[in-house]
């Protein structure tokens, strides 16, 4: 959840091992909109991830009114809403998120980019995004399961020779 600068881990109980899966994601925005009873202009695909064990595709979506929805796409290419009612989850807030009042050149809040990508390796959740430091491009490493301890954080400092200056948001 970039807006709140928080990472949520949701227990899906999706543990049945699968060898591989193929998905038809052509016009997936239209399929998602139809499943939600609206048009593609009223949904935003936030992220997609494949469960490495079950090979099921999960899609995080936001409706026009800002309501978050989690969908799954099974091997049969059928979209299903993932119920988040009474589900086990854990969360951790990202340290040093961008100031909510600061905006990019298009007027979007920088806080929406506190988490731009995630990966997982050797018990660590790896996060790239922006932070509130002078060189705001950051890379964070968070232990999982979440412990509540501060994550390791590094910022990227790049010198752009064409401009003759450091880039603070790369």
Question: How does the language model describe each region?
Answer:
Residues 1-170:
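Sequence/structural signature of beta-propeller domains
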């Amino acid at each position: 959840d970039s807006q709140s600068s928080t990472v949520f881990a949701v227990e899906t109980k999706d543990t049945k091992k699968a060898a591989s899966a193929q998905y038809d994601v052509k016009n997936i925005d239209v399929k998602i909109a139809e499943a939600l009873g609206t048009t593609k202009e009223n949904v935003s695909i936030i992220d997609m991830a494949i469960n490495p064990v079950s090979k099921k595709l999960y899609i995080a979506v936001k409706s026009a009114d800002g309501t978050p929805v989690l969908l799954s796409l099974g091997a049969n290419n059928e979209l299903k809403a993932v119920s988040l009612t009474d589900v086990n989850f854990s969360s951790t807030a990202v340290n040093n998120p961008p100031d909510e009042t600061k905006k990019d050149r298009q007027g979007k809040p920088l806080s929406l980019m506190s988490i731009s990508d995630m990966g997982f390796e050797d018990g660590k959740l790896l996060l790239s995004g922006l932070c509130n430091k002078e060189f705001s491009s950051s890379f964070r490493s968070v232990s999982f399961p979440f412990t509540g301890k501060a994550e390791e954080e590094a910022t990227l400092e790049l010198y752009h020779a064409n401009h003759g200056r450091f880039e603070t948001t790369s």
